[in-house]
Design a protein with these regions (language model features):
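A conserved helix-loop-beta module that forms one wall/lid of the active-site cleft
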Residues: 1-37, 41-44, 50
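ATP-grasp fold ATP-binding core
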Residues: 5-13, 41-61, 92-114, 120
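A broad, structure-centric signal for solvent-exposed, well-ordered loop/edge residues
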Residues: 8-10, 32, 55, 79-80, ...
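Glycine-rich phosphate-binding loop of ATP-grasp-fold ATP-dependent ligases
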Residues: 19-22, 48-82, 119
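Short beta-strand-to-turn element immediately C-terminal to the catalytic PLP-Schiff-base lysine
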Residues: 25, 72-75, 123, 134-135
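Catalytic core of tubulin tyrosine ligase-like
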Residues: 76-96
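Flexible glycine-/small-residue-enriched beta->alpha junction loops
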Residues: 117-139
Length: 139
């Protein structure tokens, strides 16, 4: 099963796990509206994240030349401009290959202060039919 980040966050939140506030959008205007709402709740820093089924989004490059499928922004206008650069464009990462993936949705969320970043995956070991939890400092 492949889930976008926003879908995984919805599942976690549904089961009581705290996740950063935010929303999903498919237009720059909607991205700005989400940001304006978050500003009204006291947020000051925002993550704009391309939603594709591939890792390495932050270091990715769009076919249009726009850099980075994950951007940290300080204002609603910056979020709007980032959304314009991402939505409807093809993001190329190490995992997508040269064809890349079309970005149709963005996650706009409050950006937490990051002290340390870890990547977590739960996989099914087919040999033992058991889940395997993997953690790494790199995605």
């Amino acid at each position: 099963m492949n889930l976008h980040e926003y879908q995984a966050k919805e599942l976690l939140e549904h089961h009581g796990v705290p996740v950063p506030r935010g929303g999903v959008c498919d237009t720059p205007e909607a991205a700005k509206a989400i940001t304006t709402s978050l500003i009204g709740q006291g947020a000051k820093l925002f993550a704009v994240k391309s939603q594709i089924h591939a890792g390495g989004r932050g270091k990715g490059t769009f076919k249009s030349g726009y850099q980075g499928g994950v951007r940290i922004c300080r204002t609603a206008d910056e979020v709007y401009e980032s959304a314009k650069g991402m939505l409807g464009n093809v993001l190329i990462t190490k995992q997508t290959g040269a064809d890349g993936r079309l970005v149709r949705k963005l996650l706009v969320a409050v950006a937490p202060k990051i002290k340390r970043e870890l990547y977590l995956a739960i996989l099914l070991d087919r040999a033992t039919s058991r889940p395997v939890v993997m953690a790494s400092t790199e995605g």
